[in-house]
Regions:
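A conserved amphipathic helix/loop scaffold
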Residues: 3-239
Length: 239
């Protein structure tokens, strides 16, 4: 991921090209992308910029800053820039906000505005969803994945020949304010699922130290598991 990094050296760009052509996945962002990464992103700059909204789920989120208008040269549109919160029936004239381009065995997702800077400053859930949709469009192979609320974090570790999937629930209930930061209660995150690539079928899987409900199966090199609850911290032990 190269977020809003302008004037990257040509030597580094050539390494990026080789990385993607060999099967790598890349996300670049910023209004400069069409001009500075055009060949890699499959676009060229058009005249003018656009401001407005980005489609996110069944709604839209306001995007701050300008999005560069582009001409598609092999890339396809992932998200358009909307003039308001509704997607028009005829979207032929919409400005691409994000695009996807296949390069060799890999692919490049480009976001043509300052979305990472916007998210850093505001943390709007809609922007997080757009970024997640762009990342998912890359279809990166070999990744472990969670289907869980955004506040559930997973970290994988190896110890004594076992794989340990740590889960942390970062949610909080009750009111928060600029002068009251106490967390009085962490609500259960509820049921969620994960997928972890594993070459061989595990002998055993269990949750520890909290033995919550667990259903798992292995197929075609992927371990899939449904976990019934997560309070604050728990571990899926894979043997």
């Amino acid at each position: 991921v190269i977020p809003e990094a302008e004037n990257v050296s040509d030597a580094f760009k050539s390494k990026l090209s080789a990385y993607v052509e060999a099967g790598g996945r890349l996300i670049v962002s910023g209004a400069h992308v069409a001009l500075q990464y055009g060949d890699l992103a499959g676009v060229s700059p058009a005249s003018g910029t656009a401001i407005g909204w980005l489609p996110a789920g069944n709604g839209a989120v306001k995007c701050s800053g300008s999005y560069q208008k582009t001409v598609l040269n092999g890339a396809r549109v992932l998200h358009p820039v909307l003039e308001n919160q509704s997607i028009p029936a005829d979207d032929k004239e919409l400005v691409p906000a994000s695009t996807l381009n296949q390069v060799g065995q890999g692919s490049v997702a480009a976001i043509h505005g300052p979305i990472f800077r916007n998210y850093f400053q505001g943390r709007y859930p809609g922007l997080r969803q757009v970024i997640g949709e762009v990342a998912a469009a890359l279809e990166t192979p070999g990744l472990s994945r969670t289907c869980a609320p955004w506040y559930v974090e997973m970290a994988l570790r190896k110890k004594d020949g076992r794989t340990l999937a740590h889960f942390v629930n970062r949610s909080v209930s009750g009111y928060q304010s600029s002068y009251y930061h106490l967390v009085e209660h962490v609500p259960d995150a509820g049921t969620f699922s994960i997928e972890i690539p594993m070459a061989e079928k595990p002998q055993r899987c269990y949750m520890s130290p909290d033995p919550v409900g667990l259903e798992w199966h292995w197929k075609d090199g992927v371990l899939s598991a449904n976990i019934s609850a997560l309070h604050i911290h728990n571990i899926l032990v894979i043997e």
